[in-house]
Regions:
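Membrane-proximal transmembrane or re-entrant/amphipathic helices at the cytosolic face
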Residues: 440-481
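Interfacial transmembrane-helix starts/ends
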Residues: 34, 68-84, 92, 210-217, ...
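Transmembrane helical elements of multi-pass membrane transporters/channels
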Residues: 2-14, 180-188, 192, 196, ...
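Short runs within selected transmembrane alpha-helices of multi-pass transporters and secretion channels
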Residues: 10, 18, 49-56, 116-135, ...
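Signature of the first transmembrane helix
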Residues: 1-56, 90, 94, 120-121, ...
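Interfacial segments at transmembrane-helix termini and the short loops linking adjacent helices
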Residues: 97-116, 315-347
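Interhelical loop/hinge segments that connect adjacent transmembrane helices in multipass membrane
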Residues: 170-178, 193-227, 289-292, 414-428, ...
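Helix-loop junctions and terminal segments of transmembrane helices
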Residues: 49-64, 265-289, 295-301
């Protein structure tokens, strides 16, 4: 429950902060910030170079083999790898910042923001390394407390910079956000470094570690960088191709990525916490030959994520306009949220499917599916955006995410030898459509949303889709963790 609570708190804080930014710099400023952070995200993925996951696995492995004698050796080797990788990527970002700003983003005013990001990149990557190390030691409570402190401190510094220096200037706002994030990373690095120094682990310099680090980190680095590169290419391409169909492409991009998506995916933070619990549980069952337990978890998790996604999809569809008017004073964002709301069940179920796939040791297949659908998304956006504008963005988003979900679910069912009954999804969608239609006749959005939940779940109970044992299982599963 700790991970779920932390995810919920951090996602809520991030959403509130996003609303503050949207009111401060507008949708065009949000679009520019999203493009800048997309480039920064790619640099961070390349700079981390898979070392977070490698440090986590190698630390856990050493603790299981030799106790704490080999932990120092693991961390020192990972530290050298991280410094070399992050410094190289940071140097490249500094050198090519003018070309990236001019040719990719189309705004030379953010050269300073990109170079500021490059200066603090090693600190961010070292934070990822120490996070992986403490995760390998299973010190989740420590990481949760530090992460909350980092988020609060980062947002505080950013708000201070915006209020005292940046104002509503988009370029300065980008630098303020990057500086605030860097200060949060610096705080995390300091705290985790102090905690590590207090451990006083014995040193065993005879343990060979270099090749093990490369074997663990390099495949992850290549896969993550390819995926991140495609995602960045997609984000950078959207405003350029939208410019052929709309007069304000940057504002449209900021409206979708900075306003609609945070609200659409906010309820999923609870499922993300559940997915963190599923990965180790399924891994234990897989190693211990617990096929019946795997089948039970698969059906229960997919069913509850479907019901959860359909419920919030209906709420966002009914209350999307009122919610976006309240948060952003932007009716166009409300229309877009209603357009994307029916995709919530698929997106939420996909998150659980990915977690179960990883728990069964099939991470490489998830990476393959993601890279394939990202390539198709880039192709689809290139051709559809100039013709249909944001509707083309929606079509490409829907088709590629549906394909990714289909491939992931099919692979999960194949490796577990399970089948799904069509009765539950068909009746769930039927009940949802009927409930939305009925509650949509209520003129007040708040009342229609309030009526939707009991109407929807009553219809599920009457049709036999929802049973008391489903809720009892969820309560037992989360309380046991």
């Amino acid at each position: 429950m700790l991970l779920t609570g932390v995810n919920l708190l951090l996602r809520f804080a991030g959403t509130v902060f996003g609303v503050y930014l949207s009111r401060r710099i507008g949708e065009q400023g949000l679009g520019l910030l999203q493009l800048t952070m997309s480039v920064g995200s790619l640099a961070m993925i390349a700079g981390i170079g898979g070392i977070r996951t490698a440090a986590m696995y190698l630390t856990a492995e050493e603790l299981g083999r030799r106790g704490r004698r080999g932990v120092n050796r693991v961390l020192s080797g990972c530290l050298g790898y991280s410094l070399v990788c992050s410094a190289a990527v940071g140097g490249l970002l500094w050198v090519f910042a003018p070309a990236i700003a001019r040719n990719w983003i189309g705004n030379t005013g953010i050269i300073g923001a990109l170079r500021l990001f490059s200066c603090f990149l090693p600190i961010t990557c070292l934070c990822a390394l120490l996070t992986g190390y403490f995760t390998g030691e299973n010190r989740i409570g420590v990481l949760a407390a530090v992460e909350i402190g980092e988020q609060i401190f980062s947002m505080g510094v950013t708000v201070l910079c915006l209020a005292l220096w940046a104002g509503s200037d988009p370029e300065r706002a980008c630098r303020s956000v990057i500086f605030g994030s860097a200060m949060g990373s610096l705080l995390t690095l300091s705290l985790l470094g102090l905690l590590y120094r207090r451990e006083r682990n014995p040193v065993d310099a005879s343990i060979p570690i270099g090749r093990r680090i490369l074997r663990a980190a390099l495949p992850l680095a290549i896969a993550d960088t390819c995926k991140g590169g495609l995602s960045t290419l997609e984000n950078l391409m959207v405003p350029k191709r939208l410019a052929l169909a709309t007069a304000d492409p940057l504002g449209a991009f900021g409206r979708v990525t900075g306003m609609v998506f945070p609200v659409l995916m906010f309820p999923a933070c609870i499922l993300f916490g559940l997915s963190e619990l599923l990965i180790p549980e399924l891994a234990r069952c897989h190693c211990g030959g617990g096929e019946k337990r795997i089948a039970y978890l698969l059906h229960r998790s997919l069913k509850l994520s479907l019901l959860y996604g359909v419920c919030f999809g209906g709420l966002l569809f009914l209350g999307g306009n009122a919610l976006c008017l309240r948060l952003y004073s932007n009716p166009e964002a409300g229309n877009l949220l209603r357009l994307f709301a029916p995709l919530a069940p698929m997106l939420y179920c996909d998150a659980i499917t990915d977690a179960m796939t990883k728990g069964l040791g099939q991470q490489h297949m998830a990476v393959r599916f993601n890279i394939l659908t990202n390539i198709l998304d880039v192709i689809g956006l290139y051709f559809l955006l100039p013709v249909w504008g944001l509707k083309g963005y929606f079509v490409s988003f829907f088709l590629t995410h549906a394909l990714n979900f289909f491939l992931s679910l099919r692979h999960l069912l194949r490796i577990t030898g399970q089948d799904l009954c069509a009765y539950i999804p068909l009746w769930t969608l039927t009940c949802a459509i009927a409930s939305v239609w009925l509650c949509g006749k209520v003129p007040e959005p708040i009342l229609s949303c309030a009526a939707f939940v009991p109407v929807f779940f009553s219809s599920l109970y009457l049709t036999g889709v929802l049973k008391g044992e489903d809720l009892r299982w969820l309560r037992r599963f989360t309380q046991a963790k």
